[in-house]
């Protein structure tokens, strides 16, 4: 069970770096078995978990749910349902205590 945290300060430089991580790069590094190239396309991917979640040109859109984003941070919060601090911790590999 995830625990609720109170205010956590995140260094602005760390936050800027985290926001720059695109979803395709994140999946290639941390969830390669979840990344699937869409047949018949040159640069469109989806996830094994959600075939209607398409990734292309630095952005992603989950067609069956009607929302999308640009970064891995957006994906972890909107799709994987991590809170903001948990998502930052995943992307940095550090605890933000």
Where on the chain are the PLM-derived regions?
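N-terminal structured subdomain of primase-like DNA metabolism proteins
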Residues: 1-97
């Amino acid at each position: 069970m995830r625990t609720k945290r109170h205010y956590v300060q995140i260094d602005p430089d760390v936050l800027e770096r985290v926001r720059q991580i695109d979803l395709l790069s994140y999946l290639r590094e941390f969830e390669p078995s979840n990344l699937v190239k869409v047949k018949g396309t040159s640069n469109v991917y989806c996830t094994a978990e959600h075939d209607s979640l398409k990734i292309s040109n630095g952005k992603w859109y989950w067609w069956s749910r009607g929302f999308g984003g640009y970064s891995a941070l957006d994906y972890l919060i909107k799709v994987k349902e991590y809170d903001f601090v948990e998502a930052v911790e995943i992307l940095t590999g550090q605890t933000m205590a």
